[in-house]
């Protein structure tokens, strides 16, 4: 006799968090609900950008579009944005979240700042 399988219902989530980690080499975006459960994520390296192209604003924009499209089934409307790192993809990723239809409730910079910890990398001289 055939067994009846229950369909797993997708959670309807109204509000969530977006974590943007913008380093000098890559941009990683993670979208979670308010409890911290991951709904979707994307990175510029995972989307096919390689080398120096990973750290461009266009790559960050594409990453944000992909991450938002992956979490469309959850019905996310409002987000709190947490930005970490000094990368160039910070502003373009935040701007893309707004154009993709998400209402940005707050933007927080959570970049860790050392209290005179490790010695920083030497500055580039080109």
UniProtKB/Swiss-Prot annotation:
The lineage of its organism: Bacteria, Pseudomonadati, Spirochaetota, Spirochaetia, Spirochaetales. Located on the platform of the 30S subunit, it bridges several disparate RNA helices of the 16S rRNA. Forms part of the Shine-Dalgarno cleft in the 70S ribosome. Coiled coil: none annotated. This is Small ribosomal subunit protein uS11. Keywords: Ribonucleoprotein, Ribosomal protein, RNA-binding, rRNA-binding. One of its GO terms (biological process) is translation. Part of the 30S ribosomal subunit. Interacts with proteins S7 and S18. Binds to IF-3. It holds the Pfam family Ribosomal_S11. GO terms for cellular component: ribonucleoprotein complex; ribosome. One of its GO terms (molecular function) is structural constituent of ribosome. InterPro entries: Ribosomal_uS11, Ribosomal_uS11_bac-type, Ribosomal_uS11_CS, Ribosomal_uS11_sf. Belongs to the universal ribosomal protein uS11 family.
């Amino acid at each position: 006799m055939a067994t009846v399988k229950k369909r797993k219902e997708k959670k309807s989530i109204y509000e969530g968090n977006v974590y943007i980690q913008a380093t000098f080499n890559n941009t990683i975006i993670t979208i979670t609900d308010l409890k911290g459960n991951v709904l979707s994520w994307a990175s510029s390296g995972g989307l096919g950008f390689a080398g120096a192209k990973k750290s461009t604003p266009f790559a960050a924009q594409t990453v944000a579009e992909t991450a938002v499209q992956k979490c469309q089934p959850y019905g996310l409307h409002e987000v709190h944005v947490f930005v970490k790192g000094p990368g160039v993809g910070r502003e373009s990723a935040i701007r893309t979240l707004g154009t993709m239809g998400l209402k940005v409730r707050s933007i927080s910079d959570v970049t860790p700042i050392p209290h005179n910890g490790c010695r920083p990398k030497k500055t580039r001289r080109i």
